[in-house]
Amino acid sequence: MLYLQKLLLIRRFFSTLAFFSMQTVFFIYLQKKGLSNSEIAFSLSLLFFCNQALAIFAGVWGDRFGLAKMMLLGCFLDVLAYIFFLSADHYFLLLLATTCFGLGSCLFGTNAKACLLAIAGDEYAEKTRLQGKYLKVTSMSSMGAPLLVIPFIKYDHINALIWACFAIEVILFVLMIKPFSQIQAVQKLVKFRFSQIRDIMTKDFLFVHLMLFIPLSIATSFFVIFPFLFDNKLGMPEHSPIALFVNGLLTVLLQSTFSRKINLTPKQTAWVAPILAVGIVAPWFLTLHYLSIYTAYLYLVIFTVIEVYALTAMANLLVKFDNGTHRGFIFGASRLLLSLATVGVMNLIPHLFLV
């Protein structure tokens, strides 16, 4: 089982590294392919939709047909996505590529979290440790992506970067085929029925999502908030990738400790969540009032600490909702609820935050 844990985490690291690298050059690469800004923008929104909103189906399919099968399908769709993406001279191929990117990432990510719960057994400490490791490797890969991309952009070899990402996904897919068959032994297949939604999505489940959606949604808006701060306000766009690197580095440093220490109950979120919300919003306006490169980075530190706390708190709370059967559905439903909240908050940020 230790081998399977490492395999899942290694696959998550390299696949996310490739995914973030691809996203970083997404706009530039497709512009050079001759696609219009509106076509690129819509395809990117389709990617995010497939990646988030379909998570609940990814979870249900994982519970019904097997976590391993859905993760392998996700790996295969990632490979297929790069084939379409490299051939994306036509808009239809681009839409196929982004759909495969979003759904592939969704299938693997949702069911990998559920699989780690199954591997961990019944011990809460082991479950939270593995969920913390999953978040940590995700942060490490997002931190490494900007560093990987810089030389490819500088020397105008973006096409080579996409081919490198494609090669990573092909190698990962081939390496995963045999080991993933062992995962089936740790899971009991469950056929989903809509009548069971009430048993799974309890009042406490909905309550913690309602309480934590503000800090989590604002944290997801990192790629809007900090480019605005460093580019529009300070006129220093070169600091945006540095901020992303610092954010990833701090996340990696904090993640293990937070995973061990944070053990909130649903009732405790009633007073912790408002503190997190105020803590991530109020310093933003103080930063704008006392604007400088130093206050910007101070806010980045505050932002990251609250982001990691909120993400870890939610991950550990989901572990408590684990009923031993509908693990895929639990993570899928959580991802869907947070994606809907994030859409609402992100549409308000330009009017309330970016002033």
Residue map of PLM features:
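Helix-loop boundary and gating motifs at the non-cytosolic
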Residues: 1-49, 205-244
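Juxtamembrane intracellular "pre-TM" segments in multi-pass secondary transporters
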Residues: 1-3, 180-211
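Transmembrane alpha-helices of Major Facilitator/SLC transporters
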Residues: 49-53, 242-263
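Conserved MFS/SLC helix-loop-helix module at the cytosolic interface between two early adjacent transmembrane helices
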Residues: 53-86
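Helix-to-loop junctions at the C-terminal end of transmembrane segments
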Residues: 55-66, 153, 254-267
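C-terminal ends and interior cores of transmembrane alpha-helices
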Residues: 76-89, 278-291
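Cytoplasmic helix-loop-helix junction between adjacent transmembrane helices
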Residues: 99-138
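A late C-terminal transmembrane helix in Major Facilitator Superfamily
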Residues: 325-354
